[in-house]
């Protein structure tokens, strides 16, 4: 039985079989969790869809995983700060409206 995509083509995209398996598993989990696909698929299974994306070059191993982790943490912090700022503005607006209501 011939695998599609070919293991040889896939190994050209990653440094080792281990890396291929890890990348495929992570991407399959992302797809199963509702991540946006990068292309149209001929397969219905998430594991095969992940392999199709790897073969096409749409999914790669990040060259600097630590930088990727730092960027992800930074995005979380920025989102939290934005939410706190929004909450602060809402509280100020409520206090202002309450103060204006007390004047009437």
UniProtKB/Swiss-Prot annotation:
GO CC, alphabetical: DNA-directed RNA polymerase complex
Biological process annotations from GO: DNA-templated transcription
Source superkingdom: Bacteria
UniProt keywords, alphabetically: DNA-directed RNA polymerase, Nucleotidyltransferase, Transcription, Transferase
GO molecular function: DNA binding; DNA-directed RNA polymerase activity
Signal peptide (UniProt feature, chain positions): none
Annotated EC: 2.7.7.6
Record keyword Transferase present: yes
Enzymatic class: transferase
Catalytic reaction(s) noted: RNA(n) + a ribonucleoside 5'-triphosphate = RNA(n+1) + diphosphate
Family: Belongs to the RNA polymerase subunit omega family.
Main function: Promotes RNA polymerase assembly. Latches the N- and C-terminal regions of the beta' subunit thereby facilitating its interaction with the beta and alpha subunits.
HAMAP family assigned: RNApol_bact_RpoZ (MF_00366)
Subunit structure: The RNAP catalytic core consists of 2 alpha, 1 beta, 1 beta' and 1 omega subunit. When a sigma factor is associated with the core the holoenzyme is formed, which can initiate transcription.
Protein name: DNA-directed RNA polymerase subunit omega
Gene source species: Streptococcus thermophilus (strain ATCC BAA-250 / LMG 18311)
The organism's taxonomic lineage, starting at the top: Bacteria, Bacillati, Bacillota, Bacilli, Lactobacillales
């Amino acid at each position: 039985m011939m695998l599609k995509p070919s293991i040889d083509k896939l190994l050209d995209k990653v440094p080792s079989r281990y890396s291929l398996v890890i990348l495929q598993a992570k991407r399959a989990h992302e797809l199963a969790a509702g991540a946006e696909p990068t292309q149209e698929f001929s397969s219905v299974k998430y594991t095969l869809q992940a392999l199709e994306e790897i073969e096409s070059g749409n999914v790669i191993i990040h060259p600097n995983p630590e930088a990727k982790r730092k960027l992800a943490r930074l995005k979380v912090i920025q989102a939290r700060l934005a939410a706190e700022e929004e909450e602060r503005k809402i509280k100020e607006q409520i206090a202002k409206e309450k103060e204006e209501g007390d004047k009437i």
